[in-house]
């Protein structure tokens, strides 16, 4: 199929912190294990569809999101990424209000904040805000997810994609694109984004029971010299009735390109591993401020 490409050009000094310190700091957060999705199903033309009614505990999620934004500011994160499905327009407003205030102590909010996607009116939308709380892009999910073996049998996500791909261009970084969960698993679509649109930084917010599919993406991105960040959420467990101990890897960072070697990087791939006693980076019961930080060194070919 055909897609319309929308280009958004950021000011050349958007990532001035990163340029000064010679690396880009990316924070990915699974947010919470408390975001339970409530949905309903309907049958149209012989196909069963599901639609999201609401996220239960949305107030807890909102607190988490605001705490993560604060943590990202303290840690000097340039791009903050959150998972799929757990967002709302109210959260978008709360975050925008927070970003619009001047931070203290010479700190800065992330240059880009990728909010948890919002499922509303048959659209699954990721909104990206700049450090002042202004909207950069809205990327809609283009490929519906098939919910398998739910109580009602297989159900297809009831979305009406807009067939638009938003590219964020920035000097020194290249082209940034967002692929919402299933979008990244569609080989033709991924191939087009990597080889035709020549994206250099791919962000994949997710709400998924398995990470096995996402490993295929790594090979594609590596060949295309594209860095990729995938983040899932621990809330999958409560929604899908899973034992959350089975969610071992909750995200990954792929640092592609010819970069200085980093001792923490195995083949340029870093897995965000959950620890069974709680999340690795905070140790707070109820995992309110979990964030994995990855630094991308500006290198030759990077």
Predicted region positions:
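Short, well-ordered beta-to-alpha junction loops that form the rim of enzyme active sites
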Residues: 84-85, 181
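Active-site catalytic loop in hydrolytic enzyme cores
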Residues: 1-21, 120-197, 216-217, 278-293, ...
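C-terminal, beta-strand-rich globular interaction domains
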Residues: 108-114, 135, 147
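N-terminal, active-site-proximal structural segment of metallo-dependent hydrolase catalytic domains
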Residues: 1-77, 86
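A structural signal for short, well-ordered beta-strand segments and their strand-loop junctions
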Residues: 28, 82, 113-116, 128, ...
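Residues that mark the start of a beta-strand
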Residues: 22-27, 174-175, 225
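CN hydrolase (nitrilase-like) catalytic-core segments centered on the catalytic cysteine
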Residues: 78-79, 86, 93-113, 119-120, ...
């Amino acid at each position: 199929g055909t897609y319309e490409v929308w280009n958004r050009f950021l000011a050349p000094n958007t990532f001035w912190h990163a340029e000064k310190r010679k690396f880009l700091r990316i924070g990915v957060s699974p947010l919470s294990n408390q975001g339970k999705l409530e949905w309903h199903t309907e049958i149209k033309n012989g196909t069963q569809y599901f639609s999201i009614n609401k996220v239960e505990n949305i107030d807890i999620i909102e607190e988490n999101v605001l705490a993560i934004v604060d943590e990202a500011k303290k840690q000097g994160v340039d791009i903050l990424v959150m998972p799929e499905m757990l967002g709302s327009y109210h959260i978008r407003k709360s975050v925008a209000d927070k970003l619009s205030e001047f931070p203290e102590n010479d700190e800065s909010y992330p240059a880009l904040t990728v909010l948890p996607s919002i499922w509303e009116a048959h659209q699954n939308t990721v909104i990206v805000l700049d450090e002042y709380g202004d909207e950069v892009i809205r990327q809609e999910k283009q490929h519906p997810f098939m919910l398998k073996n739910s109580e009602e049998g297989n159900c297809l996500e009831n979305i009406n994609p807009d067939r638009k791909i938003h590219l964020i261009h920035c000097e020194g970084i290249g082209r940034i694109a967002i692929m919402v969960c299933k979008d990244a698993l569609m080989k033709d679509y991924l191939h087009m984004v990597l080889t035709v649109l020549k994206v250099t930084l791919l962000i994949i917010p997710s709400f998924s029971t398995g990470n096995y599919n996402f490993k295929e993406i790594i090979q594609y991105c590596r060949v295309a010299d594209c860095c990729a960040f995938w983040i899932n959420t621990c809330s999958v467990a409560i929604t899908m009735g899973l034992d959350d101990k089975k969610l071992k890897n909750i995200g990954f960072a792929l640092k592609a390109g010819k970069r200085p070697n980093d001792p923490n990087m195995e083949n340029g791939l870093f897995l965000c591993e959950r620890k069974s006693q709680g999340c690795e980076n905070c140790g707070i019961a109820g995992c309110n401020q979990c964030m994995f930080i990855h630094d991308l060194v500006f290198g030759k070919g990077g």
